[in-house]
Swiss-Prot record:
Induction notes from the record: More protein is secreted in a secG or double secG/secY2 mutant (at protein level).
Family matches, as SUPFAM superfamilies: Cysteine proteinases
Function per UniProt: Not known; immunogenic protein.
Cell location: Secreted
Renumbered residue ranges of the record's region 7 X 3 AA repeats of Y-[NS]-N: 83-115
Protein name (record): Staphylococcal secretory antigen ssaA2
Top-rank lineage group of the source organism: Bacteria
Domain annotation Peptidase C51: ranges: 146-267
Keywords: Hydrolase, Repeat, Secreted, Signal, Virulence
PROSITE patterns named in the record: CHAP (PS50911)
Length: 267
């Protein structure tokens, strides 16, 4: 639709320009500087020119930068409740839509939060589970209580308890096999292993040793790993399943001496 524009130029450098469509031109000029709120195609603007020749616009109505022909224009756009103020400087465009920016930030935070929670979404589980990625990754400096030792039973001299009844692919399943089945097959989730081991007569303390089982109650199901070695500086090398890479995947890591002091060890 063809636009008709009229302008009144003041000697002080102030201009009022009314723009409307076709037969709405006259009415628009008489109503709110040419802007007719009942006409979806109507818009108007006023502007001042400073001493440097820069234009400063105030717009109302339906408007888009492509509708204004300015050879030298740098527009900073600030959107507030549908009322648009624009400052025209020199060369190029800069857009600052605060509402959109805030929405983007919120969406991003929501995504990260949901992404983190997705690691904690568990389907129906049976006994003897290990930790998910998010829980096991927090198994650092866990405060534990030393469980009492009992009748001297140990992993190194124990007897095979039989079939592995833990859930395949979980940390408990791996550790049971790694110690040759010389522990109970019905100790439940990893979080329960220290207490179950103590009741069964195994030594449980906070001292790491090669061949022991490292255990923590951290997370929804706890976590267990097999101690491969203890280094001269006190750091502990462990192997484990379902730690950060999903069920069935065996990985290894080295834990510092200070971190290791926060875990239980079943001997």
């Amino acid at each position: 639709m063809k636009k008709i524009a009229t302008a009144t130029i003041a000697t002080a450098g102030f201009a009022t320009i009314a723009i409307a469509s076709g037969n709405q031109a006259h009415a628009s000029e008489q109503d709110n500087y040419g802007y007719n709120p009942n006409d979806p195609t109507s818009y108007s603007y006023t502007y001042t020119i400073d001493a440097q020749g820069n234009y400063h616009y105030t717009w109302k109505g339906n408007w888009h930068p492509s509708q204004l022909n300015q050879d030298n224009g740098y527009y900073s756009y600030y959107y507030y409740n549908g009322y648009n103020n624009y400052n025209n400087y020199n060369n190029g465009y800069s857009y600052n839509n605060y509402s959109r920016y805030n929405n983007y930030s919120n969406n991003n935070q929501s995504y990260n939060y949901n992404n983190y929670n997705s690691y904690n979404t568990n389907s129906y589980r049976t006994g003897g589970l290990g930790a998910s990625y998010s829980t096991s990754s927090n198994n650092v400096q866990v405060t534990t209580t030393m469980a009492p030792s009992s009748n001297g039973r140990s992993i190194s001299s124990g007897y095979t308890s039989g079939r592995n009844l833990y859930t395949s692919g979980q940390c408990t399943y791996y550790v049971f096999d790694r110690v040759g089945g010389k522990i109970g097959s019905t100790w439940g989730n990893a979080s329960n292993w220290a207490n179950a081991a103590a009741r069964a007569g195994y030594t449980v303390n906070n001292t790491p040793k090669a061949g022991a089982i490292m255990q923590t109650t951290q997370g929804a199901y706890g976590h267990v790993a097999y101690v491969e070695s203890v280094n001269s500086n006190g750091s502990v090398r462990v192997s484990e399943m379902n730690y950060g890479y999903g069920p069935g995947v065996v990985t290894s890591r080295t834990i510092s001496a200070s971190q290791a002091a926060g875990y239980n060890f079943i001997h």
